[in-house]
Amino acid sequence: MDQAGIIRDLLIWLEGHLDQPLSLDNVAAKAGYSKWHLQRMFKDVTGHAIGAYIRARRLSKSAVALRLTARPILDIALQYRFDSQQTFTRAFKKQFAQTPALYRRSPEWSAFGIRPPLRLGEFTMPEHKFVTLEDTPLIGVTQSYSCSLEQISDFRHEMRYQFWHDFLGNAPTIPPVLYGLNETRPSQDKDDEQEVFYTTALAQDQADGYVLTGHPVMLQGGEYVMFTYEGLGTGVQEFILTVYGTCMPMLNLTRRKGQDIERYYPAEDAKAGDRPINLRCELLIPIRR
């Protein structure tokens, strides 16, 4: 395997082991090289020092845990292999220009300091633009679930499918435009979990015949950044992870309070009950510029 292939596999492995012991000796043993040779090869292929990259990714993961859970700061520090809360706080402040406690309490979430996972080769930013929305009345159904940070990606994919299946269970056809409103906040019952509130909704003038038990929902107006995905519905969650993990930091955007909006345009030939379906998804994230 060529050097780029070796480092690509190593990057994938590292991403799944950031909360495990990752001394350079361990990482080199995993890759099958001497520590010195691996450090040089990693720097040649990526342009980054492997130790600094691992630390920056761990701090980025800890930043997400600070925002989305109520887990104690010391627990987060230890999970991502810092030997004390003081060591963690110093490193965190150096990368994010504020302490972990202030980062957690801020009403807004700046992407400044987040170190996206390295990708070898060209990365194509999803199509995006800045838009201003008006308040829009919808009819929808809100459901919620709790899960750990480590489970959230798989849970969101399955819950999104289940909620839409329930919502459209009696629909004769799939409506031309669907809205998913998503809000995540730390669980009040378990400090290592978050509560996710997800609203499946339609515009008021499209709801007749589709929604039997919906309630009025207001899509909040304001400034948003809109990213666009086209493909199978099974790719939506990976697209959202890319937007938050890579695109928001690359654009250095600040997320303000509010719900994420998923606006779906199913393919014209999509049928109720099909899985997966082709669609276009516009992900709108509330921002402050």
Curated annotation (Swiss-Prot):
Gene3D superfamilies to which the protein is assigned, alphabetical: Homeodomain-like, Regulatory factor, effector binding domain
InterPro entries hit by this protein: AraC_E-bd (IPR010499), GyrI-like (IPR029442), Homeodomain-like_sf (IPR009057), HTH_AraC (IPR018060), HTH_AraC-typ_CS (IPR018062), MarA-like (IPR050959), Reg_factor_effector_dom_sf (IPR011256), Tscrpt_reg_AraC-type_HTH (IPR020449)
UniProt-listed PROSITE patterns: HTH_ARAC_FAMILY_1, HTH_ARAC_FAMILY_2
Keyword DNA-binding tagged: yes
Superkingdom per UniProt: Bacteria
BP term (GO), one: regulation of DNA-templated transcription
Domain HTH araC/xylS-type: 8-106
Alphabetic keyword roster: DNA-binding, Transcription, Transcription regulation
Annotated function: Transcriptional regulator. Binds to the right arm of the replication origin oriC of the chromosome. Rob binding may influence the formation of the nucleoprotein structure, required for oriC function in the initiation of replication.
Name by which UniProt lists this protein: Right origin-binding protein
Upper lineage: Bacteria, Pseudomonadati, Pseudomonadota, Gammaproteobacteria, Enterobacterales
